Amino acid sequence: MVLGRVSRRALLVGGWSILGVPLLAACLGRGKKKDGSSGGSGSAGASGGSGQGVTRTVTTVGASLEVTVGPAVVSDDVMVVPLAVHLNKMGSGGLSSDGKKFDVHLAWSGTGNFTGADGVRLVDFDADTVQETFKASSESTGLTKEEPDTTLHALFKPVSAKTINILVPESGLFEGVPVVRDGKLSDEAKKALEDVYDTESSPDPVALETFTASVDGASDTRVTGKSVVINLASDVLFASDSADLSAQADATLNKAAEQLATYPGGEVSIVGHTDDVADDAHNLDLSKRRATSVSDRLGRLTNMSAFSVSTDGKGESSPRAPNDSDGNRQLNRRVEITLVPTQAASSTSSPDASKGTGHGSGDLPKAEGPVAKGSEGVTVKRDGRQDELTFVLTEVTRRGKYLVGEVKATGGPGGTQTGPADWLQPTQLAGSARGEEDNRLTSAVTGLSLLTPQTRYYPADYTTARGSHCPLSEITADNQLGAGDATTLTVVWPDTGQDTVTLDLQPAEHSTPSPNNPFRLTDIPVKG
């Protein structure tokens, strides 16, 4: 039996999948029940105390909702964030039962063992961190015309901040939610905390990371709180089976040198890697010689005296992807430069951004699909299907080192057969923009990048408790949209340093059963 992509709503039956095992969705972990937890001193929906919640009218999987987040209330070892929701208008998409009931608890859940608001995340742009819920309560609630109101609760480890930013699945970012200390519990909060589960996510804030790639495919860069990793494609630097730098190598190495030059000093390791085509000994020797060639050339292109530099080679022993296809072998043929800086970079702006114009030097690469201004939107049709979606992004907001955008996706006549995430995959099937294949990201929005003439900026991400990378974007946008139904897809990108940005979706590199359909949105203003 062959199964197509099915939404979590279709799969969830009492918290179990159609295959008879717990269903894991995207990044958040499998829940584990904790008998007798909470002891009645968690908190939410404070009945008294200072501060008001943050209210927005949002569009979520076709439904119009008025959502009030907060105030968050801290008591003992838990901080509870209430999400009060009022149904303004029903949709006809994947979470609307016969147009009579909207299952908001499925829109905001993040795991398959229970439903509720465990998919909600806390974002601290000043500290460059994200925090997942570490406990969850199964709160199954359907909103109807007769009963349009409910409250769900997201449970976090307490933080010291006076206000917090809450990212709600397919509903947007709620900024400045007040935090109340030692507040009293509402009756709804007490009920929610009577039966809670561990989500198996990290309870502590996790550092945000950024991932960018050169437009020509010659390099990509990952920046974490501790290091900068620049991957250089060996196919650009060297001829096959050679350690002599090509005529094209300097263009790529100069970009790497510019990145290193933004740091005052640190430790730099340069490591060569190969695919598995030749034998181990040959690959190890080749990788070491290639690392030495890159190190020597960098030393002539820029002053490396502030850095402690080492070289090594690992042959085929540390592949970036399985050596099971030509595309993956190409990813594995690389030279990896890792910098552990002594201090932060001297500038947070990108080297190819020209502030004030919204464009770096040179022209953007040719668009592969329809193009329109972000405020006007583009309509994308699926090959061989009647499905169509319209994507609009009117603006992005600058928050610290990041840009926050809320992409509106609207279903065309007849609705869609799959959720928006199926349309927005990166160039690698069932994987992340990094090229890491991960089936848990099949419902995540990972392919949308901000494009400059030289660089693609992919969604910021972070390392989960399981060691995989989770994007700071929608992670379960898998519900179908009815005709005219819209939903909100929030994405957080690294700041490009521009006043206007371009949103771009690349075509898939390989033939897939459900290929994405590329498009481009231009002239998107940056606010804040």
What is the predicted function of each stretch?
Residues S214-S227, L237-V271, S295, G299-R300, ...:
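Periplasmic peptidoglycan-binding/anchoring modules of Gram-negative envelope and division proteins
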Residues M1-V6, G15-P22:
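N-terminal secretory signal peptides
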Residues N88-K145, K255, Q259, G412-L481:
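The feature marks short-to-medium sequence segments in extracytoplasmic or secretory-pathway proteins
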Residues M79-L87, L403-G411:
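Short, well-ordered beta-strand segments enriched in hydrophobic/aromatic residues
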Residues G53, G142-A207, P341, P365-V378, ...:
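Surface-exposed edge beta-strand/loop patches
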Residues H273-P351, T357-H359:
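Periplasmic OmpA-like peptidoglycan-binding domain that tethers envelope proteins to the cell wall
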Residues L28-Q52:
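Short, low-complexity, disordered segments immediately C-terminal to signal peptides
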Residues Q52-V74, K373-R398:
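Low-complexity, acidic Ser/Thr/Pro/Gly-rich terminal tails and inter-domain linkers that flank the onset
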